[in-house]
Amino acid sequence: LDSGYAYKAYDTTEELTEMREFQQINKQPQGYFGGTWRYASSADREAAEASGRTPVVRLAIPHDRKLVINDAIRGRVEFDGDTSDDPVLIKADGMPTYHFAAMVDDHLMGTTHIIRGEEWISSAPKHVWLFEAFGWEAPMFVHVPVIKGKDGSKLSKRHGDTRCLDFRSAGYLPEALANFIALIGWSPGGDREIMSMDEMAEAFSLEGLQPSPGVFDADKLKWM
């Protein structure tokens, strides 16, 4: 807060609802981009406190520059700061949000790589800026592609079994399922497809991960 990387926002629920409705009606980007409180005076903040408003703490995303992440699969990825909203870090009840708690935990645990689904890449600018705000070195980000069905849509229950327990109940061997899943979106090089757990562990590298979605082919699993 003292360094200006974060600020207290005293918006009421009603005011936030009105803001979202205004953005929708006027086809504006959705989110909180500073609102009333990012540049509010000390007097306005004191008045809000005196009136009994309880603030949240928001991260002040720089809206005048690009935010950059280095992704092990996609390389350098740039985001326009003016399209990233200011996320809540501490809620009005004093509890931290995921964005705040997870990044602090990653730092304290000495995390070197954040490996997660590509649907999280839109949150990466917030996380990178949070690391910068604390003066911490950001881990390497690895946004792996989703797994799709043979029809090209994201894998879901309508494609059939998606839980490991379902495959075990159907008689599939754990080693075969692990081998099959490992090769969706990752290539060990060459044309070898049948590998033991130890062989896959030895061959695995982030460089072998593919940026495009993999396809869940049930027929190939049966073959394995």
Located regions from the model:
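Active-site cores that bind ATP or allylic diphosphates and position pyrophosphate for catalysis
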Residues: 2-143, 148-155, 163, 188
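Catalytic adenosine-cofactor/nucleotide-binding cores of aminoacyl-tRNA synthetases and other
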Residues: 122, 134-224
